[in-house]
Amino acid sequence: MKSIARATGLLALVLVLLSFLTNHDYLWGGIRETWLRGWENAQIDDLPYRDHVRSIPASSNPQPWPDGPRFGKAQPSPEDLQWLESWKTASFLVIQHDSLVHESYSRGHDATTLTNSFSMVKSVTAMAVGLAVGQGLVDEQETMATYLPRFAEGENASLTVQQVLQMRSNIPFGESYKDPFGFQAKAYYREGNRALLQPYRVDATPGTKFQYQGGNTMLLAELLDAVRDGNLSQDVAGQLWEQMGAEHDALWGLDGDPADGAVERSFAQFYATTRDFARFGQLLLDTGAWKGQQLIDRGFVERMITPIDRLTDEVDTFWYGYQIWLGSTEDGMPFSVMEGLRGQMVVTIPALDAVVVRTGYDKGKAKKRGLPTDVFRVIDVARSML
């Protein structure tokens, strides 16, 4: 028995040493916050495992959502409640005409709980690009090489900012959420996102294929750092969060120690309350304006929520815009969706003047018209209460 224990201990030591020698030591942090907690991969409640975050302070003029006339009366049906529970829903919020229609929490969450956005924040990074466009710092029709010179050679030279916004860069980052050695795991858990990006270049003519990858969002964040001082958290804090009257601080996970120049993980790890996530939906609903004040260039927001196939004839993708998912209901109502790994979503439905937020620990795998079928069910649940 002693020899078996000794051999096991030696093997463990060798594995640890190898992980550090090959720059895969990030795996141990990932294992600690996923497998050792009984999850296959990252979860919405992983904030305690973030060693470095930037704070986005609550607004100095907080604007709570007012109760609408149906608030407290509008409830999901028993069947809908069962469905929400089956996918481990943590919060469900419905807003119409700028007022609360329904708000509910479960699994220990409440109106003050901060949860991980995962990919919902890709849309926020796009909004930050929109801020730069409005300031004349970025032209989305320009090439990436204009801002990041390493893309000046070969086919890279034709890659545009718009193509990166639309996930059609043809840069082979990879987007596996189960491969612990893949690009996405390194981007989520390892330090040094910018170093991770450096070797990647296009491997086919840019613009000719839609491929959803967080690496594109990381490139957009790097572009922003090339054209302005400050960082993503400051962009959101000073130009959106304050003006939208956010009631709570948000936190954004960093890829290392800020003293060493760490940057936000621009594709995930934005932690906010459900009510404050809804503000991004309202901002989109009002085409980049908040209570009459234009925060993001209106034309940019209009293009952001326009399907790819209406802005280019290179790719016939109708369910994606600028870092945001798009669709329409069975009866023809267009909507946009900020959507994350665990089925978190901020849905904006202009025809109903409504915003719906759902957070949770799981989602279904089925798809319909390029989107998770859960999105359509969430919309149906919300509409039943309007």
Annotate each predicted stretch with a short phrase:
Residues D98, T115-E140, V164, L220-L224, ...:
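Active-site SXXK
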Residues N216-L223, S266-A289, Q344-G360:
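Active-site-proximal alpha-helical segments within enzyme catalytic domains
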Residues S106-D110, L114, D362-K365:
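A short acidic/small-residue loop/turn micro-motif
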Residues G134-P172, P199-R201, A226-F267, A272, ...:
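Active-site helix/loop module of the DD-peptidase/beta-lactamase fold
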